[in-house]
Amino acid sequence: MEKKKYLTKITPIQEKFIEIYCAKYGEWSATQCAMAAGYARSSAHTRAAELLDWRKHPDIAMEIQERLAGLR
């Protein structure tokens, strides 16, 4: 499987957020996914919102959209 090229480097914690968010989509909130990925409880809500924002992290939002589209 070919590794995707992104506009910016996705960090391991961001990749973990993507995996958890897609696996728990509809069951867990984005904040819960961020905490499970390793973000601090005090900043998880903000980080989750930023990671899902197309303007701040287009690569992450696109990856999530592609993975969720594949689940249907």
Predicted feature descriptions by range:
Residues 1-72:
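N-terminal, charge-rich alpha-helical recognition modules
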